[in-house]
Amino acid sequence: MRLCDRDIEAWLDEGRLSITPRPPVERINGATVDVRLGNKFRTFRGHTAAFIDLSGPKDEVSAALDRVMSDEIVLPDGEAFYLHPGELALAVTYESVTLPPDLVGWLDGRSSLARLGLMVHVTAHRIDPGWSGCIVLEFYNSGKLPLALRPGMLIGALSFEPLSGPAARPYNRRQDAKYRDQQGAVASRIDKD
């Protein structure tokens, strides 16, 4: 059962759930909290690699990822990031979220953006119990026109679902937590699997 708006506010008031900066009540809807786009992005560079062997030796996978991923792009206030048709880019939420070990979160993109061809998360929409940090967005433009994305715009909504009990291995306590405390548009760390 997902938390309703009253429960989300209560969990925030009690400090059981943290969203920084705290959203105003107008952005806490029936069962979701609106989140905004941050100013950090990462793209794929022009490259000549025919493929990346994701099950290859870890050092080769790491080197291939370094060749194709850009450095982090930090946009100044007021500037737009342009996502062209058929392009994938990483970005982050403006808000940082911390979940307790007995709560899982879900990120959904906005329907208004999906109707323009923008996928806000390609596959990874679960936010694990114990997560703390900004949420990386996996943008894909499946539409016909370039889209101008501006930091601060509403980009998605979070919902929260209590677990039957606290997780024994919440994300923030796992030794293999590759994206712990991320604040930027962190590239894939599949080579750490």
Curated annotation (Swiss-Prot):
One of its GO terms (molecular function) is nucleotide binding. The active site is at E138. The gene is dcd. Pathway: Pyrimidine metabolism; dUMP biosynthesis; dUMP from dCTP (dUTP route): step 1/2. The keyword Nucleotide-binding applies. DCTP binds at R110, S111, S112, L113, A114, R115, D128, V136, L137, E138, Y171, K178, Q182. InterPro entries: dCTP_deaminase (IPR011962), dUTPase-like_sf (IPR036157), dUTPase_trimeric (IPR033704). GO terms for biological process: dUMP biosynthetic process; dUTP biosynthetic process; nucleobase-containing small molecule interconversion. CDD domains: trimeric_dUTPase (cd07557). It holds the Pfam family DCD. The lineage of its organism: Bacteria, Pseudomonadati, Pseudomonadota, Gammaproteobacteria, Enterobacterales. Its EC number is 3.5.4.13. This is dCTP deaminase. Belongs to the dCTP deaminase family. Residues 169-193 are annotated as: Disordered. It catalyses: dCTP + H2O + H(+) = dUTP + NH4(+). PANTHER family: DCTP DEAMINASE. Homotrimer. Catalyzes the deamination of dCTP to dUTP. Keywords: Hydrolase, Nucleotide metabolism, Nucleotide-binding. It is an enzyme of class 3 (hydrolase).
